[in-house]
A protein has these predicted regions:
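C-terminal and inter-domain tail/linker signature
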Residues: 1-137
Length: 137
């Protein structure tokens, strides 16, 4: 696939998440997706991707991710992202604060046969927890 086609797969992936249409994830994610950096306690694969997203939406019902930049080479696409939402639900055991939060992240997606087969992500969890008042910064 071309670099532009791979970028489009990543864009569709974010659109599916942002619209909370998890039943459409199979359009862009491999069933046996490798997610080495997923949150502790979350299963690997597409099921883990769904669980992680549902956890975010439970704590931040208006949660959205904006792609700030895409860089691609070969079969990999790097996305620099900003995630934001209002904390009106319990998140990882933290009671709702009502605060709007925004934090950044970056991930690398490897594409094969038109689907994301590997996903490595890093998010600024310190900023997220600081904005929720859990960490003193």
């Amino acid at each position: 696939m071309s670099i532009e086609a791979n970028k489009e797969i990543v864009r569709r992936y974010q659109e599916i998440y942002n619209s909370n249409q998890l039943d459409r994830l199979s359009e862009v994610l491999s069933e046996d997706l490798l997610t080495p950096k997923i949150m502790p306690g979350i299963p690997q694969g597409m099921e883990g991707a769904k669980v992680a997203h549902q956890m975010m939406v439970a704590g931040f019902p208006d949660y959205q991710t904006v792609i700030d930049e895409l860089i691609a080479e070969g079969d990999k696409v790097v996305a620099r992202i900003t995630m934001a939402g209002t904390n009106t639900g319990t998140f990882m055991g933290i009671p709702p604060t009502g605060k709007f939060i925004s934090f950044t992240g970056i991930y690398i997606a490897r594409i094969a046969n038109g689907k994301i087969v590997e996903h490595w992500g890093e998010e600024d969890g310190v900023s997220l927890l600081g904005q929720l008042g859990v960490l003193s910064l």
